[in-house]
Each structure stands twice: as structure tokens, then as C-alpha cells.
Amino acid sequence: MFSRDVRLETYDPELAKAIAAEAGRQEDHVELIASENYCSPLVMEAQGSQLTNKYAEGYPGKRYYGGCEFVDIAEQLAIERIKQVFGADYANVQPHSGSQANQAVYLALLQPGDTILGMSLAHGGHLTHGAKVNVSGKLFNAVQYGVNEQGLIDYDEVQRLATEHKPKMVVAGFSAYSQKIDWARFRAIADSVGAYLFVDMAHIAGLVAAGVYPSPMEHAHVVTSTTHKTLRGPRGGIIVAKGASEELQKKLQSIVFPGIQGGPLMHVIAAKAVAFKEALEPAFKTYQQQVVKNAQAMANTLIARGYKIVSGGTENHLMLVDMIGRDVSGKDAEAALGKAHITVNKNSVPNDPRSPFVTSGLRLGTPAITTRGYQEQDSIDLANWIADVLDAPTDEAVLAKVRDAVTAQCKRYPVYG
């Protein structure tokens, strides 16, 4: 019998202190990591529910355990809602993460040793798109494409590599690319060599849902995403498709369970269902439009302050600041900005001479600040403060001045009130 009178801060003060400190950090630091966001209290309520107790191996109506009639409702709601969000006719909401969703796609459609063609991590791709340190680069023969001197995807190079290497799968998507992707061009390249087109839209799923970024659904054989980032839900993954054959759907279903996962996380799936409902609200489109406006305001301000943005600007929620040739590294810049209560992540940029542990770049994103309520002028102010720190990363007076300004700005825009 559990006592409702015992509080976490009494039972486990060490952990409670860490949780409280993190809650405080999220309130008084500005969050510019492009892959992070704040989910709603409703999402957190669902994720903290009694559904965390329930095992439910299988799928709605086809479980290997009894007592699943209510979690079936939760999962079916998530499935139907995400189909509506993206105009899909197939959806699997069970992947525990975006990386596991990607792994499921590879294992469902490929054999070990098959060739895949994906974007280089060093040029803005993701670990799971064929990086040698990832299972996708170990199980499969991964060929990588990149960006040109303008920082744009070189579609001619993608076509040349596809023609030369005859991949079984072409992977489109990114973790650090700030322009729109020509999904139709990617599909034409894949079709030219008889390959699957697999799109990982983890970073831009919320923008796609709101119609402010082109949708890959009409072009890709299969699409994956995380459910956090711009989609603003709990941490997790999904697989969706439009026009997928029954055979393809069966392969995807069986590889998620029982192929690579056992029991799904029903409390997380319930939280996904809440987030997907939120994504169908008119306010969600307004939010995503503001995400892009804020990103463009930040990028333009940094350019005006003399900083190079890879590709020259942004058409989505993120930007890469290229500091090749500057004395400050990405690692040092991240640390200096952190002292000023601005949270970012160091990031490699194309042709980066520094190691991935040091880097010559910063990745900045606006989903989290936009959730707080930031508008363009707030983003311009923030970009100027970032430039102030980057101009003088060891000047304690500058860091203190910016920290005070950031703290005041955060108080105007509380996350949870």
C-alpha cells in the first residue's frame, strides 16, 4: 500500500533536489538547443499516469496480455491522431525513440550489407543516417552525401552517388540543415536506381504538421520522426507512411514488435496522443509560424553582427553558426554562453578543421523560446546578446551583463508559470 502523504523531497531528497534544480534551470536559462522543447502540462500529466504500470506487448486488439482494453484506447487515439496530423494511412506509435524508429525501417526493408545513401553527419545529417560509429554504418554499406560551397544539399552529387553505388535506400533528413529539402527530387533520385526513399523528419515534424515546411508524405516510401523537438510531445518516436503497400506495413509492424522492441511504453504513448491532439489545434500552426519567424530574426541579426550562418540563413527552426577562422571554438562558445544562461550546443560545420568534440560551430534553434512566447524582437535581442558573448567570451563583465538581461527576459516569459 502506497502512502500519498510521503513526498519525493522527503523520501529521496538527493533526487528531489536535482529535479528541482533542473526545473529552475529551465525557467531561468534560455533554451536554444534545436532538438529541445517544453511539452505541455497535459502531456506530462498523461506521461505520469497509471499507464506506466501496464504491459501491453502487441498492438491494439492483438495483445499478449490481458487487461489491455483501456491502453488500447490510448494507443488507438495516438494512431488516428498522428495519421490526421500528417495525412498518413499507416502509423506506428510504439518506437521508444527516433533512433529506434530509424533502426526499424532499416531492418524491415534491408539486409545487412545493403548499401544506403544518407547525409554525412559532418554536413548536417544524423548519426543514424550511416555514420560509421552508429549501427546504421556498421550493419550497412553507408555512402554519404553532403552540401556544396553554399551550404546547400548538392542534388547532383546525390544523383551521381546513387548512380554509382546503386543503394537499396536513399535517406533524406537532417539534424543540422537550415533550408528546405526538395523531397520530389530525392524521390526521383531514389526511383532512378530502384531504391526506397526513407525520410527522417524528426527536426521539422512540427513545421510539416502545421504546413510551414514542405511535407515528405507524398514522396517517401516511409517517414520517421521523434515526437519531441518541434512536435512538442514526450520523448519518443513514430513511423508513418502514405500509400504504403500492405506488405510494407506488415514488415514495419513486425519489426517494431516483436523484432526490436517488447512491451511498448503505454504512458508515453498516452502522452503522444495528447501532443498529437495539440498539433491539430489552430494555435499549433500559429506557434510553428512564429518558430520560423524567430529563427530568421536571429539568423539575420547574427549575420548583421558579422557571423556566418551556414547556407546564408534559415527556412526552418534552426541555424548553424560557422566560426571557422575565429579564435573561439564551438566548445568554448558553448561554455561561455552557458555562463550567461544561454544554452546551446557546439556543432561541427561543413569542412570543419576541429574535432567533433571541439568543433567550429554552434547550432541554435527556436522551438523552446517560441513555446515561452518569444516574438521577433525578443529573438533579435537574444541574438545580439549571443554576439556580445561570442565577441568577448572570456570577459566576465560582458557575461554578467548578458546573464542579467537573459534572466530578466526569462522572467517575462515563464515556461510553466
UniProtKB/Swiss-Prot annotation:
Keyword check for Amino-acid biosynthesis: yes
CDD domains xref list: SHMT
Claim: S-adenosyl-L-methionine is one of the keywords in the record: no
UniProt keyword annotations, A-Z: Amino-acid biosynthesis, Cytoplasm, One-carbon metabolism, Pyridoxal phosphate, Transferase
EC number from the UniProt entry: 2.1.2.1
Modified residues (N6-(pyridoxal phosphate)lysine): K229
Compartments it resides in: Cytoplasm
InterPro entries: PyrdxlP-dep_Trfase, PyrdxlP-dep_Trfase_major, PyrdxlP-dep_Trfase_small, Ser_HO-MeTrfase, Ser_HO-MeTrfase-like, Ser_HO-MeTrfase_PLP_BS, SHMT-like_dom
Site positions for Plays an important role in substrate specificity: H228
GO cellular component: a single term: cytosol
Molecular function GO terms recorded: glycine hydroxymethyltransferase activity; pyridoxal phosphate binding
The organism's place on the tree of life at top rank: Bacteria
Secretion signal span: none
Chain positions recorded as (6S)-5,6,7,8-tetrahydrofolate binding sites: L121, G125, H126, L127, S355, P356, F357
The reaction(s) this protein catalyses: (6R)-5,10-methylene-5,6,7,8-tetrahydrofolate + glycine + H2O = (6S)-5,6,7,8-tetrahydrofolate + L-serine
Cofactor annotation: pyridoxal 5'-phosphate
Pathway per the UniProt entry: One-carbon metabolism; tetrahydrofolate interconversion; Amino-acid biosynthesis; glycine biosynthesis; glycine from L-serine: step 1/1
GO biological process terms held by the UniProt record: glycine biosynthetic process from serine; tetrahydrofolate interconversion
Quaternary assembly: Homodimer.
Family designation: Belongs to the SHMT family.
The protein's role, per its UniProt record: Catalyzes the reversible interconversion of serine and glycine with tetrahydrofolate (THF) serving as the one-carbon carrier. This reaction serves as the major source of one-carbon groups required for the biosynthesis of purines, thymidylate, methionine, and other important biomolecules. Also exhibits THF-independent aldolase activity toward beta-hydroxyamino acids, producing glycine and aldehydes, via a retro-aldol mechanism.
Protein name: Serine hydroxymethyltransferase
Protein's gene: glyA
